[in-house]
């Protein structure tokens, strides 16, 4: 990680430069940086609403970033050890769905745990992929589902050699992690992609003596919820890619469903 470069916040710095120019707004959003909705400005503060602006050349565009947003994504990729990172504003729901839509088409099989998040199920509805469920065991004392065992995943792969991907919760809602490294190794040996739902695993990238993160384990893609445990505002998330994925194709998939009016 380039620690010196990580000291920069390119999007925020661009927003501050723009705010100081005191440009009169004749575009969206309708609150006109607080002037059109003083109640909102009083609630959130003038500085906050003053930074809620429309996409424009000095501030880049999330759908096709070429300057400050692109630099921010490069910084995120560097920090998380990924080949590429996408800033997501539709929560990790949009990141999970983009992962699945990027590797699955109608009729394709994907192996996933039965306690997968509903966003993954909705993605299967959208693309027509076929789920192959693995039923994690349940800890009767705690009353919670555990992670997928390697033997369970391997059995599903042997019975469905035509599956195109395996999705792993890393960790589950209750903090349970599977042996992700081994699952990645066995899936890749069969030509299958590995997708990591890390909605509750942001800390795995930065803490010591913690389970392995998706990128470190060699997963092809990982959906990381920055707002859940990373300290950012609600709905902010990251979609991480390893070198095995085509970033331009994934960008196109993201743009199919992500808003064109992203909030800064």
Labelled PLM ranges:
Residues 24-31, 50, 56, 99-110:
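A short, flexible N-terminal coil/short beta segment enriched in small residues
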Residues 48-94:
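Conserved N-terminal alpha-helix of the aminotransferase class I/II PLP-enzyme fold
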């Amino acid at each position: 990680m380039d620690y010196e470069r990580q000291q920069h916040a390119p999007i925020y710095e661009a927003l501050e430069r723009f705010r100081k120019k005191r440009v009169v707004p004749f575009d969206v959003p309708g609150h006109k940086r607080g002037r059109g909705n003083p109640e909102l400005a009083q609630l959130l503060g003038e500085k906050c609403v003053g930074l809620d602006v429309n996409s424009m050349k000095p501030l880049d565009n999330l759908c096709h970033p070429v300057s400050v947003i692109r630099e921010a994504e490069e910084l995120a990729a560097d920090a998380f050890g990924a080949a590429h990172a996408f800033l997501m504003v539709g929560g990790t729901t949009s990141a999970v769905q983009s992962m699945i839509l990027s590797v699955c088409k109608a009729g394709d099989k994907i192996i996933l745990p039965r306690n997968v998040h509903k966003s993954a199920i909705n993605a299967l509805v959208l693309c027509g992929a076929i789920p192959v469920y693995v039923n994690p065991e349940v800890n009767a004392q705690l009353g919670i589902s555990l992670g997928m065992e390697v033997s369970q995943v391997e059995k599903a792969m042997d019975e469905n050699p035509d599956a195109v991907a395996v999705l792993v919760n890393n960790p589950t809602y209750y903090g349970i992690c599977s042996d992700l490294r081994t699952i990645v190794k066995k899936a890749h040996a069969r030509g299958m992609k590995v997708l990591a739902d890390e909605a509750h695993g942001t800390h795995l990238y930065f803490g010591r003596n913690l389970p392995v993160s998706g990128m470190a384990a060699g997963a092809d893609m990982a959906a990381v919820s920055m707002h859940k445990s990373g300290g950012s505002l609600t709905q902010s998330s990251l979609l991480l890619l390893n070198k095995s994925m085509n970033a331009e194709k994934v960008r196109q998939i993201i743009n199919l469903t992500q808003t064109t009016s992203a909030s800064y």
